[in-house]
A protein has these predicted regions:
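An acidic, low-aromatic, low-complexity terminal/linker signal
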Residues: 1-148
């Protein structure tokens, strides 16, 4: 059975999501985040990375409707293509822990979690690991205004 490699991300202490192995390009352990006035609660900050200002999305805040409580904040930098053949673009996600790599097989596919709601807006698929569903994030949708 074919397998793929994914990064499992802790969005907060309870929420997990995943991205493809090649989508995460950098992890910033103690990010300097700059506040953006009058921005939505799930995207209140930006991260300067490689001389580029990236939105720092808090997907846990978007899903739960309030900012996530984290013991530590990390920022993952992710690459995505807005459309096929386009140059890669980058965005940041706020994380609650260091991502872990995992192997995923087709027979692990499952339905998206029912709670919190709105996973269908963020995710393109889902797999089960240790009896927990882990949604696979749709990064182009997330970073190109799909959450507005």
């Amino acid at each position: 059975m074919p397998e793929s490699t994914a990064w499992v991300l802790a969005l907060d202490p309870q929420l997990l999501a995943a991205v493809g192995e090649r989508e995460m390009v950098h992890l910033v352990e103690m990010p300097t985040l700059l506040e953006v006035p009058r921005s939505p609660p799930y995207c209140r900050q930006v991260l300067v990375w490689n001389d580029t200002v990236l939105p720092a999305m808090d997907l846990a805040a978007w899903l739960r409707g309030q900012p996530a409580q984290r013991q530590q904040t990390l920022a993952g930098v992710f690459a995505y293509q807005a459309r096929p053949g386009a140059d890669p673009e980058y965005g940041a996600l706020l994380l609650a822990g260091i991502p872990t790599r995992t192997r995923v097989a087709d027979n692990q596919a499952c339905a998206l979690p029912k709670q919190p709601g709105n996973w269908q807006t963020l995710a393109i698929s889902c797999f089960r690991q240790s009896d927990q569903p882990i949604p696979i994030l749709d990064l182009p949708h997330i970073f190109t205004g799909g959450l507005l």
